[in-house]
């Protein structure tokens, strides 16, 4: 039954795929593949509640099932929840980065996820820039620390963690480069 469900899914017959996969579940098959088929077919039919639940079941069986994370991202994207969609797309792409040897149907899904993730990140960056820019333009109140925080938030810079070689002083705050005026003897 599962093979027939996969064939129906590939033949763009999601209703048949869900029906056959659910029959396989009723017969005792309970693994990541059957729930993945149900998740993909339900998403393709627009039944986002069922797709979400099936993707959760697939992830419960295999926490590294990147395709189930893509389905969850698609569900949240369709439900206009960009924050959750971006998180699930990011997780999927970190579990299974795009590579040339990927099966074509999976590659298409991951390319879509990557494109949507980039679009969501760009929209978030534009939104934050639009909302925060007036505060940054106020030279009297905008400090380099505030500008650094905004750059971290927008992904323009990464947080630096020191990697001491000789001695570690645990109570020092983390600064990428300490300002020279803190050390007048240098």
Report residues per predicted region:
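Fe(II)/2-oxoglutarate oxygenase catalytic core
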Residues: 74-80, 84-186
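Canonical positions in the second alpha-helix
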Residues: 23-24, 57-58, 91-92
């Amino acid at each position: 039954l599962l093979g027939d469900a996969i064939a129906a899914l590939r033949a763009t017959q999601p209703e048949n795929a869900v029906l056959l996969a659910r029959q396989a579940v009723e017969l005792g098959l309970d693994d990541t593949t059957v729930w993945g088929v149900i998740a993909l077919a339900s998403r393709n039919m627009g039944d986002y509640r069922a797709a979400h639940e099936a993707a959760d079941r697939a992830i419960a069986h295999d926490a590294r099932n990147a395709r189930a994370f893509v389905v969850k991202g698609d569900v949240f994207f369709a439900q206009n929840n960009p924050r959750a969609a971006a998180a699930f797309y990011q997780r999927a792409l970190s579990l299974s980065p795009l590579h040339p040897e990927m099966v074509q149907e999976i590659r298409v899904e991951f390319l879509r996820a990557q494109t949507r993730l980039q679009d969501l990140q760009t929209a978030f960056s534009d939104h934050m820039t639009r909302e925060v820019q007036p505060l940054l333009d106020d030279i009297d109140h905008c400090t380099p620390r505030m500008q650094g925080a905004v750059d971290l938030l927008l992904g323009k810079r990464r947080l630096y963690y020191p990697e001491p070689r000789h001695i570690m002083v645990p109570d020092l705050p983390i600064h990428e480069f300490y300002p020279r005026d803190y050390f007048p003897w240098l």
